[in-house]
Amino acid sequence: MRVADDKTLLVPDRRGNNRIDTLRNILADPRVALLFLIPGCGETIRITGSAAISIDPKLTQSFLVEGKAPRSVLVVSVEAVFFQCAKAIVRSKLWDASRHVERKSLPSAGMILADLTGGELGGPEHDRTAPERLKATIY
């Protein structure tokens, strides 16, 4: 995410996001809301506005990471900014590591995909190859 000016944010669509549904939603209705959380910080910032999708090579190239550019960049025209106090974050103990759920107590992504697709996708092989896929598609 980059601040372009007082009223514009730029959000790259990084490789691996694969959220084409978000892009379709923006084409149908450009209104957006963004919530910014910083680990360990209780306060949040909420921004509302409208978004447009840019595939301008000059803009996408300005977001290069490890030689790879995003496929598109959301150009968010900011209409309102809200500062949220820390009460909800503090009450939820969101950043308290002692309250975090143990990862092994939850189903893996492969298990969830296998369950949702009747075994057509996912499963142990999906989980086994996940680190390699992540490394290849993170940027």
Spans of features found by a protein language model:
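Binding-site signature for planar aromatic cofactors or substrates
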Residues: M1-Y139
